[in-house]
From Swiss-Prot:
InterPro entries: E_motif, Pentatricopeptide_rpt, PPR_At4g14850-like_plant, TPR-like_helical_dom_sf. Residues 641-671 are annotated as: Type E(+) motif. Belongs to the PPR family. PCMP-E subfamily. Residues 565-640 are annotated as: Type E motif. Keywords: Repeat. The keyword Repeat applies. This is Putative pentatricopeptide repeat-containing protein At3g18840. It comes from Arabidopsis thaliana. GO terms for biological process: RNA modification.
Amino acid sequence: MKCLKDGFLHHIRSIKSGSTLTAVSSNQLVNLYSKSGLLREARNVFDEMLERNVYSWNAVIAAYVKFNNVKEARELFESDNCERDLITYNTLLSGFAKTDGCESEAIEMFGEMHRKEKDDIWIDDFTVTTMVKLSAKLTNVFYGEQLHGVLVKTGNDGTKFAVSSLIHMYSKCGKFKEVCNIFNGSCVEFVDSVARNAMIAAYCREGDIDKALSVFWRNPELNDTISWNTLIAGYAQNGYEEEALKMAVSMEENGLKWDEHSFGAVLNVLSSLKSLKIGKEVHARVLKNGSYSNKFVSSGIVDVYCKCGNMKYAESAHLLYGFGNLYSASSMIVGYSSQGKMVEAKRLFDSLSEKNLVVWTAMFLGYLNLRQPDSVLELARAFIANETNTPDSLVMVSVLGACSLQAYMEPGKEIHGHSLRTGILMDKKLVTAFVDMYSKCGNVEYAERIFDSSFERDTVMYNAMIAGCAHHGHEAKSFQHFEDMTEGGFKPDEITFMALLSACRHRGLVLEGEKYFKSMIEAYNISPETGHYTCMIDLYGKAYRLDKAIELMEGIDQVEKDAVILGAFLNACSWNKNTELVKEVEEKLLVIEGSNGSRYIQIANAYASSGRWDEMQRIRHQMRGKELEIFSGCSWANIDKQFHMFTSSDISHYETEAIYAMLHFVTKDLSEIDEIMI
C-alpha cells in the first residue's frame, strides 16, 4: 500500500468481504492513515486488531506523538498489554521533549530507560540527541554537557545528528566557544546541511550576521527553505527587521516558496514593525496558501493585529482560525493588556478549558505591566491551585515583580524556597528578580547573598544590586559593585548611572556625583536623561550649591519644556530660599502643567519655606475655581496577608479610631525622644 487511495481500497475490500486484516496490513494502514492526518481512522484500525505486535504499538503511539497528543500516547504506552522496545521509548521520549510542559516527563523517562538497560532497552544516539535538544529548549547547559560526555563516551559524538544537536544546544545556552570547537573539530563528512544550518543559527544568536551569511553563501547546497528561514529569523532577532523582509523577498526571487516557517518568521517581523498594511497582505497570502492551519502562522496573524492595536481584526482572526490555539489566545491577552483591557483579557483567559504556561505568563505580565500587583498575586494562587503546570522562571519573575511593587516579602520567600526545593534553573532573569525583590523589601543582605551565589551575571543584574544598595543607604557597596561590574567587562548603561547618582543624592556626595555624571557622558558616551539631571539638581540643591544647579540648568536643551526637571530645580531654589528664582520657575512650570494641582502646592510650599506668605496666599488663591488634578500619596500595610491602604487624613478604614489613637501615642513618644536628644 503505497498511497492513501490504495490503503482505502484495501481496507474497504476487507470490510465488505468480512475478512480479517493481517497484522502487517493493519500496521501499514495505521502508518498510512497517521501520515495522512487521519488519526481517528488510524486508531480505529488499531482497536480492531485481534493480534498486535510491538510494531502495532509503535505505529499508533507514533501517530499520537506526531499530532502532539502525548497524553493519549502515554496512556497507550502505560497500558498493561503494551509491547515496548527501544523505538517505543524513543518515540514517547521525543513527544515529551518537544511538548511544552512535559519536559519533566522526558527527564523521568530518560532515567527510566537508563535503569532498564538490563531489560534490553539500550540508550542509543537518538535517545541522547533527543535529550540534548531538550537541554537546548531548557537552556540547561550543565545537563547538556553531561549528555555531551555520554556521546563522547559511546563514540557517537561525531554523527550528523549529534553534531547538529550539540551546536544547537551550546548556541542556545550562550556557549559560542564550544559551538565553534564542535563545528571546526568535526569531520567534513559529518558536517551536513543540518549542522551548517545549526551553525548559521548559532552565529545569528551571537549577533554575527556577517559570519552567518558567509556560511550560507559558501555552501551552495544551503539554498533551501530551511536555510533561508534561519537567516530571516536571524535578522529579525538581531533587530534588523527591514533586512529580514528583504531576505524573505530574495528567497522567492531565488525560486523558493514560503512555507509555514517562512510565514511565521515574516509575521513576527511585521509584529515588531507594527506594519498593519503589509500584515494584511501577508494575511491574504496565508489564506491563499492554506497555511493558516499551522498554529504558529495563525497566532502570528493575530499577533500582528494585536501589536498594531487593531483588536477588532485580531478578534476576527482568532475566532476564525485561532480558536483552541493557546498561542493565539496568549497574543489576544497581550493585545488586550497593552490597551489596558484586563477585564476582556481575563474573560478570554477564563474561557480557556486548557491553559499552558504561555497563556498564564501572558496574564501575569499583563497585570504586572499595568502595575496591578494584587491581581498578580491572586492569579498566582489560582496557578498553584490549578496544579497542571509547573511554574517556570518567567512566571516566577512576574510574581516576584508584584512582590517588589508592594514591598511584600513573604510570597517572594515562598517562591525562593520552591525554586530551591525543585532545583529550577536559576537563570540571570530569575536571579535579578530575586535581587530586586529582596532589595525593595528592605533585605539587602539576602539580595547580596543571591547575587554573590550567581555564576553568571549581566548589566541588568548589577543594576538591580547597585540600585538596592543605593536605595537603602549603602552607597559604599553601590560604588564597589560598580567597580566590580566594570572590571568584569560589563558595560554600564543609563540605569546604572541613575542608581549611582541616586546613592550620591541620598548622602549628599557632590564630588562623587559629579565624577559619575562626567564619566557617564565622557567615558561611556551616554546622554543624560531627565532622571540623571534631576538627581544632580537635587544633589546640588541639598548641598546648598545653587550656583552649580543653575550652571547645569543652563546646559540642558529645551529645559523650559521639562516639568520634572523644573520641579527639581524649584525644590533646589526652595531649599536655598531663593524666591526670585522660585518666581521664574513658577511661570515656566505653570505654562507646562497649569492643570496639575500638585504643582501649585509645590510652588506654594516653596514660597512658605522662605517666609513669603503673601506669595503663598496668591498661589492658593489661583487654585480656587480651577478644576485641578491632585494626586494623593498613599501608604499601605500588610497584616495577615491583607493589604490596608491609607491616604492623608484618611477616615475610611473600619478601625480608624484605634489607628489614630495609636498614631497619637507614637507621635507623642517621638516628640519626647526629640526633646531628650535636644
